[in-house]
From Swiss-Prot:
Belongs to the metallo-dependent hydrolases superfamily. Uronate isomerase family. GO terms for biological process: D-galacturonate catabolic process; D-glucuronate catabolic process. InterPro entries: Metal_Hydrolase, Uronate_isomerase. One of its GO terms (molecular function) is glucuronate isomerase activity. Keywords: Isomerase. This is Uronate isomerase. The gene is uxaC. It is an enzyme of class 5 (isomerase). Pfam families: UxaC.
């Protein structure tokens, strides 16, 4: 029986151990997509205790706590920080098979030096030890980033953001990690959402464009895109809950947009036409600036109306959708490619049934003398666990070139989540090692080591250059 989480954790063969310890563990972290708050990085936020650092914004943990029967008071309610931590610790031994068990213990081990497993029995001791480390070692936001050897962070930002904290970070010569905004025009895309008209008003104000038509909207967004670009933005992000392509005319889209500004009801077909038209327009702008477009496909959000009204979005009430995506996604990419305006693009699917869809879709639009121009993104959200990552790696390697893969992202709101890069790297090395051990690939350490370091760092560092 193997010891829990020893130095060879998840490394099941000798080749995997060599690849991880000699290659994967040696390169820095390039975290090009996350949801960290730029203000907390710029102000070097100091955490008051482990609960603030660990549980305040982690909907993965919140979902598990609800499933264990823990009252909402101890999850997002007003219970004390220690009581919230204690309830989480009480649940921990029962998370067998869940990646939260692995992530949590990696975080305790790497950032706090805690070797014990977390449980009701060890809760008090671990609470005191971690809080002492936070205080004595000054575990601020920047310190955690430095400890994890992170060299690049891509935050997720709204077009109306002033990016003041990104600017502040650029002026900090003592902080070596490059923190850059990502352009996420989510609120401009969701024409059926409550508050859409008010948001367009805010966009008009910050862009100094009177927005009365769809062309005005595109102009305003392009002004903000240029502002982001001037402040280091290389990456954009779109959430596509449903991918539905309809043919449309410019006149039709303008009419739909004006209807929304007038407060009229927009039906689902009109909303789909509008979002696709805007995505295609923005995609062309991204291509002109050599920016990367990320498409996150297939989330079914805010399923629980009662809890959405009580707590809000991004609180652990989202799940996997099962809509068809292949045809419509193909048409969107092709519309951009027809004019040679398809930007570098990363496609993520939340439903693993779509792994092979994306694994083959990316091959349709490669080219432009760019290795891996169109990427099948890493296992996302409900798939960023061992089985989900392995399925993504297998689909990509069998249907494309995993050697050109830009690797892992945290996609997280937590400063402790950088251990997910270690988790990914161990799984990657084990996957490649198994191919060698089973005789499916020769043991050529130099090329294998190069592939591993490329996937873990070098491919992304190259891909996200202007």
């Amino acid at each position: 029986m193997k010891k829990f989480m020893d130095k060879d954790f998840l490394l099941e063969n000798e080749v995997a151990k060599v690849l991880y310890h000699n290659y994967a563990s040696k390169v820095p972290v390039f975290d090009y997509h996350c949801h960290l708050v730029p203000m907390e990085i710029a102000t070097d936020h100091k955490f008051k205790n482990l609960t603030e650092m660990w549980l305040y914004h982690d909907h993965y943990k919140w979902r598990a706590m609800r499933s264990f029967g823990i009252d909402e008071e101890y999850i997002t309610g007003n219970a004390s920080d220690y009581d919230k931590f204690y309830q989480f610790a009480k649940m921990m031994p029962y998370l067998i098979g869940n990646p939260i068990y692995h992530w949590s213990h990696l975080e305790l081990k790497r950032f706090f030096g805690v070797e014990e497993t977390l449980s009701e029995k060890t809760a008090s001791t671990i609470w005191e030890k971690c809080n002492k480390v936070i205080e004595n070692n000054n575990l601020t936001a920047k310190k955690l980033i430095e400890m994890a050897n992170v060299v690049y962070i891509g935050t997720t930002d709204d077009p109306i953001d002033d990016l003041r904290y990104h600017k502040q970070l650029k002026e900090d010569i003592n902080f070596k990690c490059s923190v850059n905004p990502s352009f996420r025009p989510e609120k401009a895309m969701k024409i059926q959402n409550e508050g859409f008209k008010e948001y367009i008003g805010k966009l008009a104000e910050v862009s100094n464009v009177e927005i009365k038509s769809f062309d005005d909207l595109k102009k305003a967004l392009e002004i903000r895109l240029d502002y982001f670009y001037e402040n280091g933005c290389m990456i954009t992000d779109h959430s596509l809950e449903r991918v539905v392509f309809y043919k449309f005319s410019c006149e039709e889209i303008n009419e739909i947009f004006i209807k929304a500004l007038n407060g009229e009801n927009i039906n689902n077909e009109e909303a789909s036409k509008y979002s696709v038209a805007l995505l295609i327009s923005l995609g062309k702008m991204y291509a002109e600036r050599n920016m990367v477009m990320q498409l996150h496909i297939g989330a079914l959000r805010n399923n629980n109306t009662r809890m959405f009204n009580r707590i809000g979005a991004d609180a652990g009430f989202d799940s996997i959708d099962d809509g068809e995506i292949a045809y419509s996604l193909s048409r969107i990419l092709d519309e951009l490619d027809k004019e040679d305006k398809l930007p570098k693009t990363i496609l993520y699917c939340l439903n693993p049934k779509d792994n092979e869809v994306l694994g083959t879709m990316i091959g349709n639009f490669q080219g432009g003398n760019i290795a891996g121009k169109i990427q099948f993104g890493s296992g996302w959200w409900f798939n960023d666990q061992k089985d989900g990552m392995e399925r993504q790696m297998m689909a990509l390697s069998q249907l494309g070139l995993i050697s050109q893969f830009v690797g892992m992202v945290t996609d997280s709101r937590s400063f402790l989540s950088y251990t997910r890069h270690e988790y990914f790297r161990r799984i990657l090395c084990n996957y490649l090692g198994n191919l060698v051990e089973s005789g499916q690939y020769p043991y050529e350490e130099e090329i294998l080591g190069e592939i591993v370091q490329n996937i873990c760092y070098k491919n992304s560092a190259k891909y996200f250059k202007r």
